[in-house]
Structures are given as C-alpha cells and as structure tokens.
Design a protein with these regions (language model features):
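C-terminal and inter-domain tail/linker signature
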Residues: 13-160
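Fungal secretory targeting signals
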Residues: 1-19
Length: 160
C-alpha cells in the first residue's frame, strides 16, 4: 500500500490533456510564482500533467512546476520538492502503474484529478484524488486521498 500512497501524490494522466488549455508560450520554470490568470493556470496544469504522467518525466515536471518549499500533506513523504523527486523517481514507470483519469478541474487556484490507479501485477485498483494549490504560476501545496477497491465490492461501478 505504501507504493500506492507514494504514487498518489502526483496527478495521473494517461491520455491527452484535453479539457485543460495549453499555454500559448511555455515560460517554464514557473517557480518562483508569478501572477497568472485562471486560463494560464489551466495551461500550466496541462503541461505538468503531460510531463509528469504521460511522458513520465517527474524530474522535469517537478523542477518546472513545483515550488522548492512545496507543502506536502501525504503522510509518507516530507514537504519540499526534493523529497518528492527522491521518493517518486522509482515509481514513474509504465512497468509499475497504469492511470485512468476519471475527472479533473481547476477553480480558484485549486486543481484536482480523480483517477483510477492500477499497480502492474497487483490486486484491486485504487481510486485516487490529488488536490494541488497554485500560487500564480507555481504549484505550492498538495493533498491526496486513496482508497483501494474491495475484492468483493457490492457495487460494480463504485469509485469509478
């Protein structure tokens, strides 16, 4: 379950970033923060999702989008960008996990992603929601919740 929890600290994105506006001109790195409109934040979030989950380039995504003093609310990882880099590196591989996005959004500088996470070769899938707080152009805070689907779930559509 630790692997599931560690994987849940980021966003998941197996397909295109449709629904989030692309930035017209990338000006990464986005930290330290600069002011940004909601549309710009959506574009920056789309770039983060593309780099971190589709391209599986956690180093690029975190260095370009996450503040050095990033506040991490996951109980298994300390705050700070470098701690996330150190912990997530081994897990960002299609050989370890598959993601399916169920829902996503961004409003008032808060972004969320609800996704299905399947560990390769391992048991029941988990439902995960990641929540990120932006300060302008920069991701500065993260929360997540994860729940593994019970093997004998009564409701076949529960969680997804």
């Amino acid at each position: 379950m630790l692997a599931s929890t560690l994987l849940a600290i980021g966003l998941a994105w197996p397909t295109s970033a449709s629904g989030l506006l692309p930035c017209q001109e990338s000006s990464a790195p986005y930290c330290p923060p600069r002011s940004a409109s909601p549309e710009e934040q959506r574009g920056i979030l789309g770039e983060f999702i593309q780099a971190f989950y589709k391209d599986r380039n956690g180093t690029k995504a975190l260095l370009n989008h996450v503040a050095e003093d990033y506040i991490q609310h996951n109980p298994d990882i300390l705050s700070g960008r470098q701690n996330s880099l150190d912990v997530l590196g081994p897990f960002l591989s299609p050989n370890n996990v598959n993601y399916t996005i169920m829902n996503k959004g961004l409003d008032n500088s808060i972004a969320y992603i609800h996704y299905r996470m399947d560990l390769v070769g391992g048991g029941q899938p988990s439902a995960v929601v990641d929540v990120f707080r932006f300060d302008g152009t920069c991701i500065v805070e993260h929360w997540d919740v994860a729940q593994q689907r019970p093997a004998n779930a009564t409701n076949p559509i529960a969680m997804f």
